[in-house]
């Protein structure tokens, strides 16, 4: 069984003006597709062929891990975004954020700061720890919470290819616009799972 590039949950121009169609064309259409292609080539004829993406991420290393994790991370990231989204979470998610960070404003400030300070290429995550508390975690390169006992709720991609076309080297500007796209409904479903 080969992996395929999952369909975006919206049109490539749907996130504009925050993330341009050109960025989606490269980030999704080229980078994400390349990870899928590389993964398929790397697992051919190995014990990983026929396994689920999550199982491969949890049990592999090296090139197979890097490509599998990047396929998973990107798919998760696209679902964390939505057109006409943003604002603040409500219900149990809002309560959990307030319990763990004091307020939504404090969470947003801490998450943004962690993403800005995430050195080099990587991901910044909101996760639910094994004890049920929410935490902000930054990973490098293809790192993912799937290899831990934490449940990923939200992520932002801070590899330069995620924002360079629209924001050049201004990661803080990208993060400011990221908040206008956060799909809180998806994040809430992850918390409830």
Swiss-Prot record:
It catalyses: 2 superoxide + 2 H(+) = H2O2 + O2. Its EC number is 1.15.1.1. The keyword Transport does not apply. GO terms for molecular function: metal ion binding; superoxide dismutase activity. It holds the Pfam family Sod_Fe_C. Gene3D superfamilies: Fe,Mn superoxide dismutase (SOD) domain, Iron/manganese superoxide dismutase, C-terminal domain. It is an enzyme of class 1 (oxidoreductase). The keyword Hydrolase does not apply. Fe cation binds at residues 27, 74, 157, 161. Binds 1 Fe cation per subunit. Its cofactor is Fe cation. It comes from the Bacteria. Keywords: Iron, Metal-binding, Oxidoreductase. PROSITE patterns: SOD_MN. Belongs to the iron/manganese superoxide dismutase family. Destroys superoxide anion radicals which are normally produced within the cells and which are toxic to biological systems. Homodimer. PANTHER family: SUPEROXIDE DISMUTASE, SUPEROXIDE DISMUTASE [FE] 2, CHLOROPLASTIC. This is Superoxide dismutase [Fe]. It comes from Salmonella typhimurium (strain LT2 / SGSC1412 / ATCC 700720). The lineage of its organism: Bacteria, Pseudomonadati, Pseudomonadota, Gammaproteobacteria, Enterobacterales.
């Amino acid at each position: 069984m080969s992996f395929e590039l999952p369909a975006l949950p919206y049109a490539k121009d749907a996130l504009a003006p925050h993330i341009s169609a050109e960025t989606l064309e490269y980030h999704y259409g080229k980078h994400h597709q390349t990870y899928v292609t590389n993964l398929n080539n790397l697992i051919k004829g190995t014990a990983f062929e026929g396994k689920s993406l999550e199982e491969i991420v949890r049990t592999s290393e090296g090139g197979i891990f890097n490509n599998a994790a990047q396929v998973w991370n990107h798919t998760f990231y696209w679902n964390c975004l939505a057109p006409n989204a943003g604002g603040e979470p409500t219900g149990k998610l809002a309560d959990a954020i307030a319990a763990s960070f004091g307020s939504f404003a404090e969470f947003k400030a801490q998450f943004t700061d962690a993403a800005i300070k995430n050195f080099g290429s990587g991901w910044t995550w909101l996760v639910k720890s094994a004890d049920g508390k929410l935490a902000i975690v930054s990973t490098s390169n293809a790192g993912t919470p799937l290899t831990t006992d934490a449940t990923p709720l939200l992520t932002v991609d801070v590899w330069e290819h995620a924002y360079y076309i629209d924001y050049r080297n201004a990661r803080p500007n990208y993060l400011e616009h990221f908040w206008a796209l956060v799909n809180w409904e998806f994040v809430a479903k992850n918390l409830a799972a």
